[in-house]
Amino acid sequence: MQTRTTPGAMLKAMREKPPLVQCITNYVAMNIAANVLLAAGASPAMVHAAEEAGEFAAIASALTINIGTLSTQWIDGMQAAAKAATSAGKPWVLDPVAHYATAFRRNAVAELLALKPTIIRGNASEIIALAGGESRGQGVDSRDPVEQAEGSARWLAERQRAVVAVTGAVDFVTDGERAVRIEGGSALMPQVTALGCSLTCLVGAFAATAPEDIFGATVAALSTFAIAGEEAALGAAGPGSFSWRFLDALAALDAETLDARARISAA
């Protein structure tokens, strides 16, 4: 993997100096996203009001924007925060949840893309549609395999000059030049609502820890998530027990275990 340090080293650095991550995420995801960041060692702040989102983004270590439960007022806050983060040189992550579903969502995402996100994280259907392709997404769920979105991700990364992460059974990360696949996780993960949204927040935490290596930070976040998912699945009876086991596994994951178990290959 062509990064400047290992996922484990980034995880250790994050815990030694916890980043403050502003998460503008949806109502469904707020609780689990905050708990995922706490378990990983970061500090969450769920600040989305237009009256303060921009001001807060200037002092946060990173910003994440998820359009899951969208409204005009939320869009104002998202845009203010994205502009402030960019002006302050802070990394920010865009999660374009089901942006293809309505004109309202498509327009909101187009405006956010113009503000140059550092990282774009989505499922295969979202990334394919974002690149102008025809996706088979149904609501917030992807009906396209990750490998089908790899070309779209490369194109989008080059066009936006951003790192693009496509998450699914096997994750794919590219900056338009480099690309890797990340194996791991569990089939139970899609059965826990908003777990993927919480991954977007974790990507922001790693980006804040290693802003000089955004590609490596994104790979580290996805690897951390995958290994925690594998560990949580051991002994889980179903999605309910998996959800709390996931937080425990994430909190218990150490740098050495992460580096030993991460399965990252060039793509």
Curated annotation (Swiss-Prot):
Keywords assigned by UniProt, alphabetized: ATP-binding, Kinase, Magnesium, Metal-binding, Nucleotide-binding, Plasmid, Thiamine biosynthesis, Transferase
Molecular function per GO: ATP binding; hydroxyethylthiazole kinase activity; magnesium ion binding
Gene3D superfamilies in the cross-refs: 3.40.1190.20
Top-level division of the source organism's lineage: Bacteria
Biological processes annotated in GO: thiamine biosynthetic process; thiamine diphosphate biosynthetic process
Pfam family, one: HK
Binding site for ATP: R121, T167
Pathway: Cofactor biosynthesis; thiamine diphosphate biosynthesis; 4-methyl-5-(2-phosphoethyl)-thiazole from 5-(2-hydroxyethyl)-4-methylthiazole: step 1/1
InterPro entries assigned to the protein according to its UniProt record, in alphabetical order: Hyethyz_kinase, Ribokinase-like
Entry EC number(s): 2.7.1.50
Protein residues bound to substrate: M46, A194
Catalytically driven reaction(s): 5-(2-hydroxyethyl)-4-methylthiazole + ATP = 4-methyl-5-(2-phosphooxyethyl)-thiazole + ADP + H(+)
Cofactor section: Mg(2+)
Job description of the protein: Catalyzes the phosphorylation of the hydroxyl group of 4-methyl-5-beta-hydroxyethylthiazole (THZ).
UniProt record similarity statement: Belongs to the Thz kinase family.
NCBIfam families given in the database record: PRK09355.1, thiM
HAMAP family attached to this UniProt entry: Thz_kinase
Record's protein name: Hydroxyethylthiazole kinase
The species this protein was found in: Rhizobium johnstonii (strain DSM 114642 / LMG 32736 / 3841)
Gene name of this polypeptide: thiM
